[in-house]
């Protein structure tokens, strides 16, 4: 019997010998720096995977796909309680999939952005417009009725190096999204940010999202962190350092992506990922500060992180790494009691600007054209292929049509720092100095001409 057949035979033994997901979902609420089940009052730990077949820039909405129920059965085998979805079509019907997930005890953390709707790293002020906010608000409307929506991400890795300029507008988006939920949803749905693990500004960025007025602060914060590789340890991986750094952080923290793949390679050319960090993540050392995490990623893509192979006939085949992760989840219980969470804490102090961190404490006001959506609702959802907010030198994204090009999808890197995003703009955030000067000059010239034209 081949290795693949042995793996599949073990898989078919079913969840009876492994940890089962609870077969119901109640809204998740936040108390102090932790998540709790609103009905049972038990602490909730995220045990999940990142779920976007085709990659994070795929046009396929997995929550509207006919294949969702197949995947839910596999999630149940894996023993998870949460999936993260990077992109959805807000005009599609998600009832069947969301209900199937709920019946399996599985929650969804949803990124509100798409490859056509996000804050541009290069032109954040221009991409923050009515087209963009209408899309985000319409996505909230499409999902606010599902009790198993754990939360929304207002951004993913918009900052992935030392240039943090765009983060001011992401925090403004966080404020706007929270305000929209408060006005138009029957329940509070938490809103947070998923950060790249950039050592130079890791702390400043986290504190920035947790400082200022409550209406502007994130409800939770997450890292895409790949520091633990293979058979590592709390010390070698830096996990102990992260615990110390965030010991006084007052909102829930979790790993929105984890699972290094720079490890020993199997004979089938796939990485041998032992997932030994699972025991650490759900240990008494971690749970006073962190509330679990999501393994990157469900489906096999060219980047070699996938747990499940989806063939051309849409059939699923689990990998050795899937079986390994399933066993690690099964043998690692959550800590008893409340896991040492902090019942009350103080918001962070807004970090000072420096050569490695630059953001405004005073946030920009919501665009005038978007205020009608805040007041009266987003209106008709326009879907992934609807108008884009992306800006080019001849289009500011604030009209009903866009000339913006689709950015090329990015795969996960093979190093320990994640850089997944929807490119967040038409130009790279790592432009050369001369390129930045040229862009700045063109912007200034364009705005001058625009103002002159409007004045005329």
Swiss-Prot record:
Disulfide bonds join 68-97, 211-350, 229-260. Splits internally a 1,3-beta-glucan molecule and transfers the newly generated reducing end (the donor) to the non-reducing end of another 1,3-beta-glucan molecule (the acceptor) forming a 1,3-beta linkage, resulting in the elongation of 1,3-beta-glucan chains in the cell wall. Involved in spore wall assembly. Glycans are attached at residues 248, 353, 415. (1,3-beta-D-glucosyl)n 1 binds at residues 86, 156, 296. GO terms for cellular component: plasma membrane; prospore membrane; side of membrane. Residues 433-456 form a propeptide. It is a lipid-anchor; GPI-anchor. PANTHER family: 1,3-BETA-GLUCANOSYLTRANSFERASE GAS1 (PTHR31468), 1,3-BETA-GLUCANOSYLTRANSFERASE GAS5 (PTHR31468:SF5). Residues 334-353, 384-434 are annotated as: Disordered. The active site is at 157 (proton donor), 257 (nucleophile). This is 1,3-beta-glucanosyltransferase gas4. Residues 1-25 form the signal peptide. Residues 417-434 have a biased composition (Low complexity). One of its GO terms (molecular function) is 1,3-beta-glucanosyltransferase activity. The keyword Cell wall biogenesis/degradation applies.
């Amino acid at each position: 019997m081949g290795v693949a057949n042995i793996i599949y035979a073990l898989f078919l033994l079913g969840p009876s010998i492994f940890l089962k997901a609870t077969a119901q979902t109640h809204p998740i609420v936040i108390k102090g720096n932790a998540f709790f089940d609103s009905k049972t009052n038990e602490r909730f730990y995220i045990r999940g995977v990142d779920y976007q077949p085709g990659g994070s820039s795929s046009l396929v909405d997995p929550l509207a796909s006919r294949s969702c129920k197949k995947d839910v059965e596999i999630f149940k085998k894996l023993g998870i309680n949460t999936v993260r979805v990077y992109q959805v079509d807000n005009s599609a019907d998600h009832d069947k999939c969301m209900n199937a997930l709920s019946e399996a005890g599985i929650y969804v953390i949803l990124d509100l952005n798409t490859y056509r709707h996000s804050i541009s790293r290069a032109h954040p002020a221009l991409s923050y417009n009515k087209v963009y906010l209408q899309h985000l608000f319409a996505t909230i409307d499409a999902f606010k009725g599902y009790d198993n929506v754990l939360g929304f991400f207002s951004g993913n890795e918009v900052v992935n190096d030392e240039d943090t300029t765009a983060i001011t507008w992401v925090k403004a988006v966080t404020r706007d999204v929270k305000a929209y939920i408060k006005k138009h949803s029957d329940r509070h749905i938490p809103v947070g940010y998923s950060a790249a693990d950039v050592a130079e500004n890791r702390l400043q960025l986290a504190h920035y999202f947790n400082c200022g007025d409550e209406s502007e602060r994130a409800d939770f914060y997450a890292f895409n962190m790949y520091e633990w590789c293979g058979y590592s340890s709390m010390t070698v991986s830096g996990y102990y350092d992260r615990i110390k750094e965030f010991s006084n952080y007052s909102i829930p923290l979790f790993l929105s992506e984890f699972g290094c793949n720079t490890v020993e390679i199997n004979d089938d050319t796939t990485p041998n990922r032992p997932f030994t960090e699972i025991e650490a993540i759900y240990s008494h050392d971690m749970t006073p500060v962190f509330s679990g995490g999501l393994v990157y990623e469900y489906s096999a893509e060219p980047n070699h992180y996938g747990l499940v192979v989806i063939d051309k006939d849409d059939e699923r085949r689990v990998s050795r790494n899937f079986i390994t992760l399933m066993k690690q989840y099964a043998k690692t219980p959550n800590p008893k009691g409340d896991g040492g969470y902090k019942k009350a804490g103080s918001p962070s102090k807004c970090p000072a600007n420096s050569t490695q961190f630059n953001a405004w404490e005073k946030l920009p006001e919501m665009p005038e054209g978007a205020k009608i959506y805040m007041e009266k609702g987003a209106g008709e959802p326009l879907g992934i292929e609807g108008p884009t907010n992306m800006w080019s030198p001849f289009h500011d994204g604030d009209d009903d049509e866009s000339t913006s090009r689709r950015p090329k999808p990015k795969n996960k890197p093979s190093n320990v720092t994640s850089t997944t995003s929807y490119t967040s703009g038409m130009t790279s955030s790592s432009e050369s100095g001369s390129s930045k000067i040229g862009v700045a000059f063109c912007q200034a010239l364009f705005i001058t001409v625009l103002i002159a034209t409007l004045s005329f």
